[in-house]
Amino acid sequence: MNGFHSFSSAAFFAKNPGRKLTMSLPDIYCTVISALQWRKNGNSITMLTDSAGAELFSALGINDIWNDIKVVIPDDLDGIDPVMFWAGGKLIALQQFPAPCAMIDTDFIVWEDPSFEDKIIAAHEEDLMPSVYPDVSSFRLKGKVLDEGLDYTTLPLNTAFLYIPDEDFKQYYTSRSIAFMKSAVYGGDYLTYMVFAEQRLLPMLAKRCGIGYTTLLDKDRLFLPQSRYTHLWGAKQKMRDDKAQLDKFCERCRERIRKSYPEYEYIIGNIERAEK
């Protein structure tokens, strides 16, 4: 299966003008293992990024973890507010990458492939918590960008992993999501806008088109031990405040690379030299 990672620097530079683009050590090692395990499973993976991202990966010496790197995300996100829609580049990347394809967050690891058939596959469903997924009437939008006939009782789909088998639906989803992001006028919590564009529109549009979908994980069992998939988002949040835990995690990642992907052990040296 053809998959891709994506990386946009727009949100970083919007929040940190004039600063050098950086990536935390846990983020780097998560990215490496996510890519190498996907390839070990017999798949291919491309990094879709912007010009600053491509320069960063080259400086880190990790280009070889992907089959290819392509600069397809505009540095300015093509007019999308990068603070409000920090993951907007991910949807631009998805629009550019041909289906069938798997979009994989850099902190999501697929240890065993699912069965890629004719259904959309997402990471897991999410509950419709009003604080995260408020009523659509709360959004301030320029123009009419939401289609008629959407079922707003549909549970959102987390897209840390997303497989889309059909190019026509992929273009429909990404075009509607991008239109929403470009039309949004800030009027509340950034998070609610971002997750609507990325995670709530997806299943509603699929239902509207009569396209089936499934998930890798049960939303009610997310915090139980998993063997086929690992999502490290929560762990990374904790490590930001605990250096001992961060160091331990990075050493475990180095051990995993040496054991499971020995031909890429040199990547560890590249990363450590770049981080000094």
Language model segments and positions:
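N-terminal anchoring/stem segment of glycosyltransferases
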Residues: 1-77, 233-276
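A short acidic (Asp/Glu
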Residues: 16, 56-60, 113-115, 201-205
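A conserved donor-nucleotide-binding helix/loop in the catalytic core
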Residues: 26-28, 33-34, 75-104
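Hydrophobic anchor at the start of a short beta-strand
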Residues: 44-45, 101, 211-214
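Short, polar loop motifs at secondary-structure junctions
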Residues: 50-55, 105-112, 219-220
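GT-A fold catalytic core of metal-dependent nucleotide-sugar glycosyltransferases
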Residues: 89-130
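Conserved catalytic core of nucleotide-sugar-dependent glycosyltransferases
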Residues: 115-182
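Catalytic core and acceptor-binding pocket of nucleotide-sugar-dependent glycosyltransferases
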Residues: 152-240
